[in-house]
């Protein structure tokens, strides 16, 4: 049974939208970034949710575009002494925890995540202390401090398999922070899961009414859904999965049209995988909204070309990720458990 804990609702201070660059400015910063990457012995590690021009640059410079799990793997294996992480702050922290000898730079340290912000360590630690009989499993979208409080870290790509494993051992689970992903995992496994009440501000906004209207316009389209979405959206899906799993589903499904319910940043790599198919954004906004779909993380959008160039050029406190040594030691154990478990699934 999944029991829901309801912390005080958080209000997130969204960042301002980056100032658009003209074509000449974009080219200037692209060339500058390429030069700085070579000078700093650096490589770009970009998430699927960053803007297309950022993902393209990562490709052109031998970097990585992936989900959170593969980002974690890539950074540990690459020979570069500096990682430029284009994503949100927890991704940079994870890179530093796993590769402490490397310099970890980000375009901005102000790139937050609503799941991270919605799971403050003091409240979460008290929640865990109130349920000492439960194994603590936290999503990768959390701070280093929350990871250090956990027994396991997990990404959406292996969440179901891990909870199945723990359930087979008779363990009861605390799951944090995403309530929708926690509910999905519980329903898939039947495990005893006690959920924290966090949510992703992007996926939480997908609406069944608007999606039903879109399905009527495109009746032959398949619906691909990330499990951070509400249960009502997941129940409508033809395929449910992590970012990497949705790209695989796009390739295997026979449908020529695909409605995609996740951050629209994924369209860059998904369209590469299925150039012959039409990709449609799942609607998030209600009547009167100014966008057809608002499905793009405002913090991911902070990873612009100018900010990346500044991060590589300036470094320092405004761009370099630091993790307290004690926190790093505490967070490393559950992260390594995740990587070891993921390796057994691939074996």
UniProtKB/Swiss-Prot annotation:
**Which PANTHER family does the annotation name?**
QUINOLINATE SYNTHASE, CHLOROPLASTIC, QUINOLINATE SYNTHETASE A
What GO terms fall under cellular component here?
Answer: cytosol
Name this protein carries in UniProt = Quinolinate synthase
Which Enzyme Commission number(s) are listed? Answer: 2.5.1.72
Pathway(s) annotated for this protein in UniProt:
Cofactor biosynthesis; NAD(+) biosynthesis; quinolinate from iminoaspartate: step 1/1
Q: Respond yes or no to whether keyword Transferase is given for this record.
A: yes
Sorted UniProt keywords: 4Fe-4S, Cytoplasm, Iron, Iron-sulfur, Metal-binding, Pyridine nucleotide biosynthesis, Transferase
**GO MF entries:** 4 iron, 4 sulfur cluster binding; metal ion binding; quinolinate synthetase A activity
Q: Which Gene3D superfamilies match?
A: NadA-like
Quote the record's binding site residues for [4Fe-4S] cluster. 113, 200, 297
Which species is this UniProt entry from? Salmonella typhimurium (strain LT2 / SGSC1412 / ATCC 700720)
User: Which GO BP terms sit in this record?
Assistant: 'de novo' NAD biosynthetic process from L-aspartate
Q: Which residues bind iminosuccinate?
A: 47, 68, 139-141, 156, 226-228, 243
Catalytic activities: iminosuccinate + dihydroxyacetone phosphate = quinolinate + phosphate + 2 H2O + H(+)
Its family remark reads: Belongs to the quinolinate synthase family. Type 1 subfamily.
User: How does the cofactor attach, per the note?
Assistant: Binds 1 [4Fe-4S] cluster per subunit.
Q: What induces it?
A: Repressed by NadR and partially controlled by cAMP.
Group of enzyme by EC: transferase
Cellular compartment(s): Cytoplasm
């Amino acid at each position: 049974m999944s029991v829901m804990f309801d912390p005080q609702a958080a209000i997130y201070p969204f960042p301002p939208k980056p100032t658009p660059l003209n074509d000449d400015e974009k080219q200037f910063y692209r060339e500058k970034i390429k030069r700085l990457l070579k000078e700093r012995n650096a490589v770009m590690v970009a998430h699927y949710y960053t803007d297309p021009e950022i993902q393209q640059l990562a490709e052109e410079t031998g970097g990585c575009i992936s989900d959170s799990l593969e980002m974690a793997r890539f950074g540990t294996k690459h020979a570069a002494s500096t990682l430029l992480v284009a994503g949100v702050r927890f991704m940079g922290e994870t890179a530093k925890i796993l590769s402490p000898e490397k310099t970890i730079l980000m375009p901005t340290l102000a790139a937050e995540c609503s799941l991270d912000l919605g799971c403050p360590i003091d409240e979460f630690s008290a929640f865990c202390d109130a349920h000492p009989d439960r194994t603590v499993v936290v999503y990768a979208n959390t701070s280093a401090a929350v990871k250090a409080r956990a027994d396991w870290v997990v990404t959406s790509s292996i969440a179901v398999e891990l909870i199945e494993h723990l359930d087979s051992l008779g363990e009861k689970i605390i799951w944090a922070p995403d309530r929708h992903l926690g509910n999905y995992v519980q329903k898939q496994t039947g495990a005893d899961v006690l959920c924290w009440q966090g949510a992703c501000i992007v996926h939480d906004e997908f609406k069944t009414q608007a999606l039903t209207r879109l399905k009527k316009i495109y009746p032959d389209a398949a619906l691909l859904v990330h499990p951070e979405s509400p249960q009502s959206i997941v129940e409508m899906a033809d395929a449910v999965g992590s970012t990497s799993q949705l790209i695989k589903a796009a390739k295997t499904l026979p449908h020529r049209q695909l409605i995609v319910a996740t951050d629209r940043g994924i369209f860059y790599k998904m369209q590469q995988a299925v150039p012959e198919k039409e990709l449609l954004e799942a609607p998030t906004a209600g009547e009167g909204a100014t966008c057809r779909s608002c499905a793009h993380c405002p913090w991911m959008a902070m990873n612009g070309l100018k900010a990346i160039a500044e991060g590589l050029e300036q470094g320092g406190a405004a761009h370099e990720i630091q993790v307290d040594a004690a926190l790093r030691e505490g967070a490393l154990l559950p992260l390594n458990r995740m990587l070891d478990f993921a390796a057994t699934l691939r074996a």
